Amino acid sequence: ALTFVLPLDDQVFTRELWESATECPVVFPDGVGVVGWMVPGGRAIAEKTAELMEKYDVAIWAHHGMFCSGEDFDLTFGLMHTVEKSAEILVKILSMTPRKIQTITPENFRELAHDFNVTLPEEFLYEKKK
């Protein structure tokens, strides 16, 4: 559902998902990639997804679904479950208000990354316009 209301942009999707559940940057620190609408099951969507999977472990297919990759079934299932949970929380937030009053800040993400020994790309830690 989020591909109908968020810009189809890796930075925006990653940041919104990260802000919706504190564990997200720890579970998918590289962020998520977004594929604009494409015919499902075809070569073009497969190639675009493969391109994104060079950088991310998660690809969101606009108006279709999600593709995840991990070291084994359990890690991959946990990854998909975490993304799905965060998306569900974000849908609930957006159903209540178009803007958040408080959220996890870039500095909070940096603290989290330090304490959990993960590296978060700075491209996702931008200051949002108020």
Feature map (PLM): residue ranges:
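Glycine-rich flexible loops
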Residues: 1-130
